[in-house]
UniProtKB/Swiss-Prot annotation:
It is a single-pass type I membrane protein. Glycans are attached at N35. The chain crosses the membrane at residues 54-71. The gene is TMEM167A. Keywords: Glycoprotein, Golgi apparatus, Membrane, Signal, Transmembrane, Transmembrane helix. The lineage of its organism: Eukaryota, Metazoa, Chordata, Craniata, Vertebrata. Residues 27-53 are extracellular. It comes from Gallus gallus. One of its GO terms (biological process) is protein secretion. Its main location: Golgi. This is Protein kish-A. Involved in the early part of the secretory pathway. One of its GO terms (cellular component) is Golgi membrane.
């Protein structure tokens, strides 16, 4: 089933996108900082969410991992 129609898969994809963008921005900030608007601005926004809300994102990742490993 597609990640769009399965809510848990959609949350997993969003969390992975946020974590990946934050990691890429920590390695090469200029790569994401030049595209703050438009379609590619989504990646910059995900990186900002990952940086500013990192404790909450980390808790969500742990909860999602627990859910995937032990609940399903």
């Amino acid at each position: 089933m597609s990640a769009i129609f399965n809510f848990q898969s959609l949350l997993t994809v969003i969390l992975l996108l946020i974590c990946t963008c934050a990691y890429i921005r920590s390695l090469a900030p200029s790569l994401l900082d030049k595209n703050k608007t438009g379609l590619l601005g989504i990646f910059w926004k995900c990186a900002r969410i990952g940086e500013r809300k990192s404790p909450y994102v980390a808790v969500c990742c742990v909860v999602m991992a627990f859910s995937i490993l032990f609940v399903q």
